[in-house]
Amino acid sequence: MAKKSKALRAAIEKIDATKLYSVEEAVALAKETSFAKFDATVEVAYNLNIDVKKSDQQIRGAMVLPNGTGKTARVLVFAKGAKAEEATAAGADFVGSDELVAKINGGWLDFDVVIATPDMMAVVGRLGRVLGPRNLMPNPKTGTVTMDVTKAVEESKAGKVNYRADKAGNVHVPIGKVSFDTEKLVENFKALNSVIAAAKPAASKGAYITNLSVTTTMGPGVKVDSASF
C-alpha cells in the first residue's frame, strides 16, 4: 500500500491543481500519471448544476462511443421465440427467460448488460433487487427495453456506455483504456461531452457543467476546461 501511495503522490506532483487543462492536455496527462500495473480505465467525471429531485432535471441515457471502451460487454437478453433467435444471431452471450431469472437469483452475475423485450419486463421485474443496485435493470431511456433487439445487442458490443446523474449531480462515464491513442480518447471524450451538453435541462440556470475532470483507475484527477471543447 505504501508503494501505491508513493506512486500516487508522484503522479499528483505532475498535475497543477490550480489549472484547467484543455481536453487534449488533460487526457495526455491522465495517461502519463496512470501508475496501475494493468490497462487502466480512463473515466470522465462531471458535476452538473441540476436538481435531480425534480423529474425534469434528471440526466440519464446511453450512447455509443466512436472508438469503443476497450471492453467487450457480456450481453444478456430476456426474450422468447423469434426475438430470442434474433438476439442470438446479433451476438448476445446469454438469451432466455425464467431459467435465467432462477440462475441470477442463485447468485450468477457473469454479464455486463441486460436487455429485454417489453413483454419480458414482468419476468425481469422479479430481479429488481438484484439488478437495480448494480445499474443493470433494463430501461427504455438507455435503449435496453426494446423490440429492436439486434440494434441493442450490437450497440452494447460496440462500446455503448450509460450515463446517469447521482443525487449530487455527478456523472461518471468510462471513455476507454490507457492503452488507447490519446486522439481516440479525446474523440470519445468530445462525443460524450456533446451528449451531456445537449442533455442540459431547460430549468437549469447558470453554469451547467460546474466541474469536469478526467482520471484513470487509482490515478489522480485532472481538471478540464469545459470551454476547450
Curated annotation (Swiss-Prot):
GO cellular component, one term: large ribosomal subunit
Alphabetical UniProt keywords: Repressor, Ribonucleoprotein, Ribosomal protein, RNA-binding, rRNA-binding, Translation regulation, tRNA-binding
Pfam families for this protein: Ribosomal_L1
Name of the molecule in the record: Large ribosomal subunit protein uL1
GO biological process: regulation of translation; translation
Assembly behavior: Part of the 50S ribosomal subunit.
GO molecular function: rRNA binding; structural constituent of ribosome; tRNA binding
Described purpose of this protein according to its UniProt entry: Binds directly to 23S rRNA. The L1 stalk is quite mobile in the ribosome, and is involved in E site tRNA release. Protein L1 is also a translational repressor protein, it controls the translation of the L11 operon by binding to its mRNA.
Highest taxon in the source lineage: Bacteria
Keyword Ribonucleoprotein: yes
Entry's family note: Belongs to the universal ribosomal protein uL1 family.
InterPro entries: Ribosom_uL1_bac-type, Ribosomal_uL1, Ribosomal_uL1-like, Ribosomal_uL1/biogenesis, Ribosomal_uL1_3-a/b-sand, Ribosomal_uL1_CS
